[in-house]
Amino acid sequence: MANWLNQLQSLLGQSSSSTSSSADQGLVKLLVPGALGGLAGLLVANKSARKLLTKYGTNALLVGGGAVAGTVLWNKYKDKIRAAHQDEPQFGAQSTPLDERTARLILALVFAAKSDGHIDAKERAAIDQQLRGAGVEEQGRVLIEQAIEQPLDPQRLATGVRNEEEALEIYFLSCAAIDIDHFMERSYLNALGDALKIPQDVRDGIERDLEQQKRTLAE
């Protein structure tokens, strides 16, 4: 795997030594202690969202299947998403390779960060400077720059999702990175949930749990 991708995985808290078999175990292995806070701190402007992502980065985003929702509820979420994809025979049969999954999570984080329409030239320059300061090589910076330049496209994030764990991680990460205080953010999450076929009760549960976590961190 390219060194620049390893660096981005490090910022996401992913182990560069992860194998396809470990990736099959989902976020428990994909986002390990130290996860997400580094990259989220560079891309997410909202203070409470950044605190939340940093918290789960420090303690592992998901522990045993769901630090926020709890393992039992998290598994119920997955069951409901799997049922929503029952007309897709191959869904759940395999996992996306780790490098593709990394790039997709980065794209999801960038899309969430700009879902209110605000990543201007000054902010982009600041992001690039911080990425350079974090030691991310040119190819990694280009990946993020390209993601920033792309129009918001929830369907693109959903394309290639192979199982319920991958669908859930994208929606969870996006909700964690967004404070829904603008109709554009709500519209984006609605479109993303539709594209990923996340049932409405699962969306509501994730948002409710994350909002409670954000309120707790703000106290």
Curated annotation (Swiss-Prot):
- Compartments it resides in: Cell inner membrane
Give UniProt keywords alphabetically: Cell inner membrane, Cell membrane, Membrane, Transmembrane, Transmembrane helix
Question: Keyword Ubl conjugation: yes or no?
Answer: no
Task: Enumerate the Cytoplasmic topological stretches.
Answer: 75-219
Main location per UniProt? membrane
Per UniProt, what is the membrane topology?
Single-pass membrane protein
Q: Name one GO cellular component term.
A: plasma membrane
Specify the domain of life of the species encoding this protein.
Bacteria
- Report TM segments: 52-74
Instruction: Quote any Pfam family the record assigns.
Output: DUF533
Q: Which residues form a coiled coil?
A: none
**Topological domain ranges for the Periplasmic compartment:** 1-51
The keyword Membrane appears for this protein: yes
Q: What is this protein called?
A: Inner membrane protein YebE
Task: Supply the source organism for this entry.
Answer: Escherichia coli (strain K12)
User: Which taxonomic lineage is given here?
Assistant: Bacteria, Pseudomonadati, Pseudomonadota, Gammaproteobacteria, Enterobacterales
Gene name for this UniProt entry: yebE
